[in-house]
Amino acid sequence: MYINTHDSIFGAGNHKTFTFLYIISLHSSYKLFHFLKMQQNTNVVFKLEVDERKKKKAMKIVCGFSGVTSLNVMEEGKLTVTGEFDNYEMTKKLKKICKHVAIIAAEPIREPEQNRNPVTRREPNREPEQNRSRVTRREPSREPEPNRAPLARRESRPRTHSRPSIPHARPSRVRGENSDGCIIM
């Protein structure tokens, strides 16, 4: 198959053109056809008539294909292959080892559909911060009480500053089998 194309490099005004000649052999186009024919994520079940030794060889050949994601061999001579591969090429390779190879089932694996309307959780109606806040301590009143003594009135005022508390080391006694009850400071 010959394809001739003319293409101008420098635009329509220039007379320099180049001719590209593509020669595509039938063999390479055949392989290209099968490469493009590869199905995505297929599940193929082969029926094989083999003994244990040839079953291991068949598994080795199938594992050698690129795109095979899983392989399952059953006792009845069924071989289940999952992945992205060419069914025709795999059958051709298996026929070199086994006497009889047949494709029982070939189906594409469908990905689970995502839910178009995802479930959203409803958030409870929240009240404004002012209503939610709880008073945890009693606020001292600013108005002086007439029935209290003047010292009691002074104590009811809120403190503006406080002294930091200094932790004091407590003496501890060590008691044990070999100790005589000494005090450590």
Curated annotation (Swiss-Prot):
PANTHER family: COPPER TRANSPORT PROTEIN FAMILY-RELATED. Belongs to the HIPP family. A lipid is attached at residue 182 (S-farnesyl cysteine). Residues 183-185 form a propeptide. Residues 39-106 form the HMA domain. Residues 109-158 have a biased composition (Basic and acidic residues). InterPro entries: HIPP, HMA_dom. Residues 109-185 are annotated as: Disordered. This is Heavy metal-associated isoprenylated plant protein 11. The modification Cysteine methyl ester is found at residue 182. Probable heavy-metal-binding protein. Keywords: Lipoprotein, Metal-binding, Methylation, Prenylation. GO terms for molecular function: metal ion binding.
